[in-house]
Structure formats: C-alpha cells, structure tokens
Amino acid sequence: MNPPKSAPDAQGLSYRDAGVDIDAGDALVDKIKPFAKKTLRDGVLGGIGGFGALFEVPKKYREPVLVSGTDGVGTKLKLAFHLNKHDTVGQDLVAMSVNDILVQGAEPLFFLDYFACGRLDVETAATVVKGIATGCELAGCALIGGETAEMPSMYPDGEYDLAGFAVGAVEKSKIIDGSTIAEGDVVLGLASSGIHSNGFSLVRKIIERANPDLSADFHGRSLADALMAPTRIYVKPLLALMEKIAVKGMAHITGGGLVENIPRVLRDGLTAELDQHAWPLPPLFQWLQQHGGVADAEMHRVFNCGIGMAVIVSAADADDALRQLADAGEQVWKIGTVRASREGEAQTVVV
C-alpha cells in the first residue's frame, strides 16, 4: 500500500492563509468592550465573552411577557460603503428592532448584533459597534452580546452585513395590540429624523439618475449626511407616555410606509384617514420625489415621508399626548383620525 502523497517542502497552512484573522477578531473584542460596558443596566448577569449572555427579568414585572424583534439595515449599507461612513448604521440597526417591539408596549431589555464580512477591518467594525452601543444607550437596553463572522469570499472587501436582535418585556395586562382602537380615535405622527432605514434601493436609484454632489450643502448639512441620518429611537418618550396615557396602538413606519404599517394595528372594519397637509413633507423627501419623479402614492408606500412612528389615542387624550411628547422633545402632529371603513376601502388612506 502506497503512503499518501505529501508536499514536504510546502509551508503548512494557517487559518490566516485561508483568510480568517483570529488576532483581528480578538483585537475587535478588546476595542468594543468599553462601548458595551456603557450600556449595562439592571438585569445583566456577566459580561461579553461568554458562550451565552444572561439577563434577569426585572422584578418590577408581575406577569412579564417577553417581546422579541429582529431586523437589519438593508441597502442603506451600500450607501455607507460608497461614502465610507460607518458611524451611524449601528444606531439604525438598534432602532429598527427596538422601535418594533416598543409598539406592543415593550421596554427593550437587551440587544445582540451580528456583523458579517469577507475580511475583518477592525477599525470599521469597531466604528459600527460603537454606533450600536449608542443606539442601545438611547433605547435603555444592554448590548449583551453578538457575533462577528469573518467569511472569506462571501463579501467583497470593504463590505459587510448587519443583523440585530432585541428582546423586551411588557406586563401581560398592558400589551398594546390595537384591540381597543375605535372610531373617532386620533392618529398622532412623530417626526422621523430622515429616511430611516427603508426605501434605500429606490433612494440609490434616484441618486444614480440625478448624480448629485453628495458633499454639497443641503439645508445646513451635506446631502450625504441628510441621507445617512440615523433612524430615530422613540423608546424613552413613548414609554413615558404610556405611563400617563392609554395608548391604544402604535405603528413603526418602516417598509411599506404609512399606508402599509398603520393597518397592522387596526381591527377589520376600521380605516385611518390621514391628512397629508397636517404635517410638512421634509425637504429631503421633496428632493427625492422631484429627482425621481415619484408619484404621491408611491412615496406613501415606500417612505415614511417625515413620520417615523404613529400613535393612536382617544380624542379625549390627544391634546395631553401631544403636549407630553412635545415636552419630551418630539415633533408631533395630529395627522389623522380613525373611522369606519367604506366598502372595498384600504385600512389607511391619505387624502
């Protein structure tokens, strides 16, 4: 029997030769530990680096229900790569999940992230994770763990993908599911910070067509900064509102815009009628509509059009809710009312 052929003169291979740099991964962990530490809150048991992250549900909950959400940043990342701007997409990642679980009344407790790339650039990854930690601080949740996956040939150099996972808790008796929404209720709209993290495939197509100077001034900042403005996190002002006022329903205005997200919290037979003149269309959306020739109906089903969160309360509570949110620093408008649906009508209409 012949022995297996070998190459005695060839140098032995290492994981680094295959494209995975374990030392870079270790260096990243060292860089991000201080960011994660700033997000620690009551309930965290242990620190980053264990096989699993431990969290004790706060004792203030008598019948806690856990609420989970997961999301990404979508093709906004392609614009981040083009601009070499990585400091805000981490906040986007957190916002997409914590705002989603917030609408059911949940207080975000902890967050985990997944960062995938072909070749790990420690500085870029650390910048992204610093943004994630900033988002967690704004949401009051702990960055409790994550995964960095360096996968040679899976992604081009300089590119990466992100996913985030948020878990929160709500008292079982205080779950917000839209079941109490009734005719005559008022829809409040909280201002977005910009495009947030949806519709960027269309945004990039408009940029391709218009070929603008992204460094040019756009209402006091560069057009690039306006396009990349991080998604607003509504957690703290809305949790405070829920302590004082009976919030009947909330909708995070993400993919599908106003007309496809508000119906997710409405019972059959109800329609939210929104007045498009009740709030100003921000200049960035005007620019996108003008340079893309985008129809009004398409704008309303792709973009948030200046409204990042819709909150539904009774007519009797509407003024108090407006006042409290404004005092908390939110821009907010009465943007519509709830009424009985007409035959064959959509559950959200913009007039």
Swiss-Prot record:
Gene Ontology MF terms: ATP binding; phosphoribosylamine-glycine ligase activity; phosphoribosylformylglycinamidine cyclo-ligase activity
Family: Belongs to the AIR synthase family.
GO cellular component, one term: cytosol
CDD domains assigned: PurM
Organism expressing this protein natively: Burkholderia pseudomallei (strain 668)
Principal cellular location given in the protein's record: cytoplasm
Domain of life: Bacteria
Subcellular location: Cytoplasm
PANTHER family, per the entry: TRIFUNCTIONAL PURINE BIOSYNTHETIC PROTEIN ADENOSINE-3 (PTHR10520:SF12), TRIFUNCTIONAL PURINE BIOSYNTHETIC PROTEIN ADENOSINE-3-RELATED (PTHR10520)
Disulfide bonds: none
Pathway(s) where this gene product acts: Purine metabolism; IMP biosynthesis via de novo pathway; 5-amino-1-(5-phospho-D-ribosyl)imidazole from N(2)-formyl-N(1)-(5-phospho-D-ribosyl)glycinamide: step 2/2
Pfam families hit by this protein: AIRS, AIRS_C
EC numbers for this chain: 6.3.3.1
Entry's Gene Ontology BP terms: 'de novo' IMP biosynthetic process; adenine biosynthetic process
Record protein name field: Phosphoribosylformylglycinamidine cyclo-ligase
Keywords: ATP-binding, Cytoplasm, Ligase, Nucleotide-binding, Purine biosynthesis
Catalytic class of the enzyme: ligase
Reaction(s) the record says it catalyses: 2-formamido-N(1)-(5-O-phospho-beta-D-ribosyl)acetamidine + ATP = 5-amino-1-(5-phospho-beta-D-ribosyl)imidazole + ADP + phosphate + H(+)
Gene3D superfamilies according to UniProt: PurM-like C-terminal domain (3.90.650.10), PurM-like, N-terminal domain (3.30.1330.10)
